[in-house]
Regions:
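Short phosphate-binding/catalytic loops that engage adenosine nucleotides
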Residues: 10, 106-107, 158-160, 170
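Modules that initiate DNA replication and primer synthesis
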Residues: 121-163
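Short, small/acidic-rich helices and loops at N termini and domain boundaries
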Residues: 1-41, 85, 154, 171
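Flexible loop/turn segments at secondary-structure boundaries
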Residues: 99-100, 143-144, 170
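Phosphate-handling DNA/RNA-contact segment within nucleic-acid enzymes
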Residues: 25-132, 147-148
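A generic structural-conservation signal
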Residues: 14, 24, 111, 162-164
Length: 171
């Protein structure tokens, strides 16, 4: 799993700071009430982002990439508790891996549950009290570009900026 994270410049210290855990096994009950279990392998590692009594399981190389367990939080904001009290800029990204990579390289970043999540205005208002610039930095695939435009328009009264990196737009 360390090789997976190293590709994105994410070190062990960053993973610990963000409460990201390696999972050997995950057991739960499906929405149909049937128990199931998943096992982590070298080809299909399994990681967990822990937020209190809620866990988001991430399987980067699997068809079913995300699973959720525990008591879901109302406003899922990954990286919020790691933010400094004040800062110049903060990136709002499309996913946890982006938050981890940016943080490992010295940038402040958060993400919501996905790029298609509606960003709560009260969170934007709170961030503006702490940071001079809020920047949307989503993926450059079709969804990311569409949602960047939608979020910038929805949050226009807050003068949220956006950045599109010159990448191919693939995962």
């Amino acid at each position: 799993e360390r090789n997976y994270w190293r590709r994105y410049g994410i070190d062990t210290r960053t993973l610990l700071r963000f409460h990201v855990k390696s999972l050997a096994r995950y057991e739960s009950v499906s929405s149909q009430g049937k128990p199931f279990s998943l096992v982590s392998t070298r080809e299909e590692p399994m990681l967990a982002h822990c937020l209190g009594r809620f866990v988001k399981v991430y399987r980067p190389n699997s068809k079913l990439r995300f699973l959720y367990g525990g008591k879901e939080v109302d406003d899922y904001v990954f990286g919020f508790e790691q933010l400094p009290c004040k800062g110049d800029m903060i990136f709002i990204t499309g996913g946890e891996k982006d938050v981890l990579s940016l943080s490992a390289h010295g940038f402040n970043a958060i993400c919501f549950n996905s790029e298609t999540a509606q960003i709560p205005e009260n969170i934007i208002e709170g961030l503006l009290l702490r940071f001079r610039h809020l920047i949307i930095l989503y993926d450059t695939d079709e969804t990311g570009l569409r949602e960047t435009k939608r979020q910038v328009e929805a949050l226009s009264k807050f003068k949220v900026l956006h950045l599109t990196l010159p990448l191919q737009g693939t995962k």
